[in-house]
């Protein structure tokens, strides 16, 4: 599968690849956040898979407020056909949370995944106690799929949410 990452735009956000000049803004997100390691991960993702997290910038101010993108694209193991499933993740800096930016970005990423990459399914995970992240997934149109036990994922129990391309296309979410 050949992937090509494009810039995305929403009502309030411009989304693009991360670059070295983003380091100081990324470092301000959280005191413990390792901006250098994150940006190296981004460069590796773009180089190896032509895909990675999009930087989320407010159109109004140009402020870098978070990231959203695919952390994995793999065969969809829920079917016996050769189809692709994308797993999404997102992060919004604390001072920008609660404004719907993650949901807005996620919907744009999902549209790109279904329309440009031709994914058949998109899924996202969250810890059961992370109610805000669960709301982002729900507000973006994903439905609860199942619990993933710690033994399966290698991390604490997680709630898996998913949406199929057909369900996305039938919803109002597929419209920009």
Regions found by a protein language model. Give the residues of each.
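GNAT-family acyltransferases
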Residues: 1-95, 108, 112, 116, ...
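Conserved beta-strand-loop-alpha-helix junction that forms the acyl-donor binding cleft
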Residues: 124-134, 152
